Curated annotation (Swiss-Prot):
<protein>
    <recommendedName>
        <fullName>UDP-N-acetylglucosamine--N-acetylmuramyl-(pentapeptide) pyrophosphoryl-undecaprenol N-acetylglucosamine transferase</fullName>
        <ecNumber>2.4.1.227</ecNumber>
    </recommendedName>
</protein>
<keyword id="KW-0328">Glycosyltransferase</keyword>
<keyword id="KW-0808">Transferase</keyword>
<dbReference type="GO" id="GO:0008360">
    <property type="term" value="P:regulation of cell shape"/>
</dbReference>
<dbReference type="GO" id="GO:0009252">
    <property type="term" value="P:peptidoglycan biosynthetic process"/>
</dbReference>
<keyword id="KW-0131">Cell cycle</keyword>
<feature type="binding site">
    <location>
        <position position="196"/>
    </location>
    <ligand>
        <name>UDP-N-acetyl-alpha-D-glucosamine</name>
    </ligand>
</feature>
<keyword id="KW-1003">Cell membrane</keyword>
<dbReference type="Pfam" id="PF03033">
    <property type="entry name" value="Glyco_transf_28"/>
</dbReference>
<dbReference type="GO" id="GO:0071555">
    <property type="term" value="P:cell wall organization"/>
</dbReference>
<dbReference type="GO" id="GO:0051301">
    <property type="term" value="P:cell division"/>
</dbReference>
<dbReference type="GO" id="GO:0005886">
    <property type="term" value="C:plasma membrane"/>
</dbReference>
<dbReference type="GO" id="GO:0030259">
    <property type="term" value="P:lipid glycosylation"/>
</dbReference>
<dbReference type="GO" id="GO:0050511">
    <property type="term" value="F:undecaprenyldiphospho-muramoylpentapeptide beta-N-acetylglucosaminyltransferase activity"/>
</dbReference>
<keyword id="KW-0132">Cell division</keyword>
<comment type="similarity">
    <text>Belongs to the glycosyltransferase 28 family. MurG subfamily.</text>
</comment>
<dbReference type="InterPro" id="IPR006009">
    <property type="entry name" value="GlcNAc_MurG"/>
</dbReference>
């Protein structure tokens, strides 16, 4: 009997990353892999770029809002359409399980899977759940959480952060020779990572303050190909895949938003980092919670976007560098990182138990 698994999740890179870690493991073990998402969403782009033999099923999707908006009336019909489409897909594919990484597009497949008797496994990365995963929790067989859950529920399993990077991930520096030739080896190297939604503020600061490259080598992942540049002490690139971890290793310090995936990658690498979280006006507040947690644990410092400017940036960078031993000690003592292989084995075992009715 062919083993089949459905994945869902999208809207941002963070809702796809873990799926892309797990998919090749299922493929290697002989599973047939399917993905439900929005063909206009980043999940479709990432699956296509991966080259994995995954069957992508597109559905309609609508945003779920906690506040009144006339757009809600339209999106209700989109979600309902997505639910019907998901029911048809699941009936056709007949998967043994659905794994959801969250995002608005995941809600219809999660509900449809439960209605069709397919076990639903959900992953939550943030300290508090978004609306999509709050809904998913009601239909899930198991929910895995990165942080200790604030909700008491027997189906919730705290597993820590699943990341494929580590402090011992290898030396990639020869691949960066062109960039290194432009950098001053006497200067510290800063890496700015804004994520799919938060790079603009970092881009503007670097564009408006060219003197920053007199004090530091600067790497800026911009999300905007028009800003691509390699010049003295400056490398700006819109998007990276294979170079992502090498650039992380090259950096002495990373300035990042508060997305949990990136934060836990930095923790796994024991990389100094300054968090500039998206505020509640640009997110549901999860990045603020993540940043507060990391600062409280002693892993990082945070700086609000309102106070983010060249002077405060340089001040925080100097503080982190001067106190790097204490931050690295806190990160080295963390027990929050779980390897993808360990999580994959746990997930496979849970799927097997559900198949046996346990």
């Amino acid at each position: 009997m062919t083993k089949r698994i459905l994945f869902t999740g999208g809207g941002t890179v963070g809702h796809v990353t873990l799926n892309l870690i797990l998919i090749p493991k299922f493929l290697k073990d002989g599973w047939e892999v399917h993905y439900i998402g929005d063909k206009k969403g980043i999940e479709y782009q990432e699956i296509q770029k991966s080259g994995y033999p995954v069957t992508f099923h597109a559905i309609k999707t609508g945003k779920l809002r906690r506040y009144f908006s006339w757009q809600n009336l339209i999106d209700v019909f989109k979600v309902a359409t997505g639910l019907l489409q998901s029911l048809v897909i699941i009936n056709k594919v007949k998967p043994q399980a659905l794994f959801s990484k969250g995002g608005f597009v995941s809600v219809p497949p999660v509900i449809a899977s439960r209605l069709m008797g397919v076990p639903v496994f959900v992953h939550e990365s943030d300290l508090s759940m978004g609306l999509a995963n709050k809904i998913a929790l009601k239909f899930a067989s198991t929910m895995y959480t990165t942080f200790e859950s604030q909700v008491t529920n027997p189906i919730i399993k705290h597993i820590g952060a699943v990341t494929k990077v580590s402090k011992e991930s290898g030396n990639y520096l020869p691949e960066l020779s062109d960039i290194q030739n432009k950098f001053n080896p006497q200067l510290k190297t800063l890496l700015f990572i804004g994520g799919s939604a938060g790079a603009k503020v970092f881009n503007q600061l670097i564009t408006n303050n060219p003197d920053l490259t007199k004090a530091f080598n600067v790497i800026n992942i911009t999300g905007d190909s028009q800003l691509n540049e390699l010049s003295q002490n400056l490398y700006r690139v819109d998007y990276v895949t294979d170079l992502y971890q090498p650039l992380m290793q090259l950096a002495d310090l990373v300035i990042t938003r508060g997305g949990s995936n990136t934060l836990f990658e930095l923790l796994a690498m024991q990389k100094l980092h300054l968090i500039v979280p998206l505020g509640k006006e640009a997110s549901r507040g999860d990045q603020l919670e993540n940043a507060n947690y990391f600062e409280k644990q002693g892993y990082a410092r945070q700086l609000s976007e309102e106070l983010f400017n060249p002077e405060t940036l340089i001040s925080e960078v100097h503080y982190l560098l001067e106190h790097q031993d204490q931050f690295r000690k806190a990160m080295s003592e963390s027990q929050e990182i779980k390897s993808p292989d360990v999580f994959y084995d746990l997930l496979k075992n849970d799927i097997s138990l559900k198949a046996k009715g346990k």
